[in-house]
Amino acid sequence: MQTLHALLRDIPAPDAEAMARAQQHIDGLLKPPGSLGRLETLAVQLAGMPGLNGTPQVDEKAVLVMCADHGVWDEGVAVSPKIVTAIQAANMTRGTTGVCVLAAQAGAKVHVIDVGIDAEPIPGVVNMRVARGCGNIAVGPAMSRLQAEALLLEVSRYTCDLAQRGVTLFGVGELGMANTTPAAAMVSVFTGSDAKEVVGIGANLPPSRIDNKVDVVRRAIAINQPNPRDGIDVLSKVGGFDLVGMTGVMLGAARCGLPVLLDGFLSYSAALAACQIAPAVRLYLIPSHFSAEKGARIALAHLSMDPYLHMAMRLGEGSGAALAMPIVEAACAMFHNMGELAASNIVLPEGNANAT
């Protein structure tokens, strides 16, 4: 059975030759070179992923939603009752939440995964529960390093198993009351930003309670002293089971050479951890939308990512990842279905990148 160290070691590098061939093919399509903008660069990125065999393609699609509760909820950093995590996880199994509707529209299957819900097991939810909620990061670590490593490996294996069964495009999502607080702590640590710069309203936290949330994040970092150069240390000390789970999806998909669509702010924090743990993961990450959460800009700048959609969304759940799946499919359709200039009577001046 593969260890976490072996999984990280075996993440493949991008196929530079395949990317060059893809760029050459795209430049020869029936359009001015570069005129489809980022759709072209996305197709080239996909072509470099070894799991897609040198060509942009999408077969089965899956959104993996990591569900967990957080001890830091006790600090008054969220307005929703903790039980909402379990209620919404159950609603996901019925297909009635935002991510389920958007995923169905995109033709993707939603996998609802319990990595730490503080409730009785829920029928229809995949059980990878580490504990009933993680520790309160304002007073100590979220979990042990061993727990974080074990969950990373378990989720990575689950992701790779889905890849073996035909999934070629993954989306990540989360569900957990108070989870924007550990996400803000992680972004603060990885980017070196003060908590005031990254803490937002989450699920409609009143402005009068923001200062408390900022203070909680600062205390969590001061008490736990996470090492920003050690992604697993940050996850285990100021993260949460859902954030570890999303990081595991990214590591597992990268190990299989396959793309992962990020969601919003929570997924950005997990992406920062994944890229710190294994920098090669970066090639496989596709930013879906620009989260409306306050710290989004800082996190995305640190990741050097520019999301494809600006929708003022902050639902989470993987909703943005599901919404962006058709964009990935459009890049593949462009690559495979457009005609070629060489077969037409059109001759474009060299360097012309403007649409006619």
UniProtKB/Swiss-Prot annotation:
A Pfam family: DBI_PRT
Entry EC no(s): 2.4.2.21
InterPro entries according to UniProt: Nict_dMeBzImd_PRibTrfase (IPR003200), Nict_dMeBzImd_PRibTrfase_bact (IPR017846), Nict_dMeBzImd_PRibTrfase_N (IPR023195), Nict_dMeBzImd_PRibTrfase_sf (IPR036087)
GO molecular function terms listed in the Swiss-Prot or TrEMBL record: nicotinate-nucleotide-dimethylbenzimidazole phosphoribosyltransferase activity
Active site location: E317
Record's catalysed reaction(s): 5,6-dimethylbenzimidazole + nicotinate beta-D-ribonucleotide = alpha-ribazole 5'-phosphate + nicotinate + H(+)
Any one of the GO BP annotations: cobalamin biosynthetic process
This protein's UniProt keywords: Cobalamin biosynthesis, Glycosyltransferase, Transferase
Pathway involvement of the protein, from the record: Nucleoside biosynthesis; alpha-ribazole biosynthesis; alpha-ribazole from 5,6-dimethylbenzimidazole: step 1/2
Functional description taken from the UniProt entry: Catalyzes the synthesis of alpha-ribazole-5'-phosphate from nicotinate mononucleotide (NAMN) and 5,6-dimethylbenzimidazole (DMB).
Similarity annotation: Belongs to the CobT family.
Assembly mode: Homodimer.
NCBIfam families: cobT_DBIPRT, PRK00105.1
Record PANTHER family: NICOTINATE-NUCLEOTIDE--DIMETHYLBENZIMIDAZOLE PHOSPHORIBOSYLTRANSFERASE
Name of the molecule in the record: Nicotinate-nucleotide--dimethylbenzimidazole phosphoribosyltransferase
Gene it is expressed from: cobT
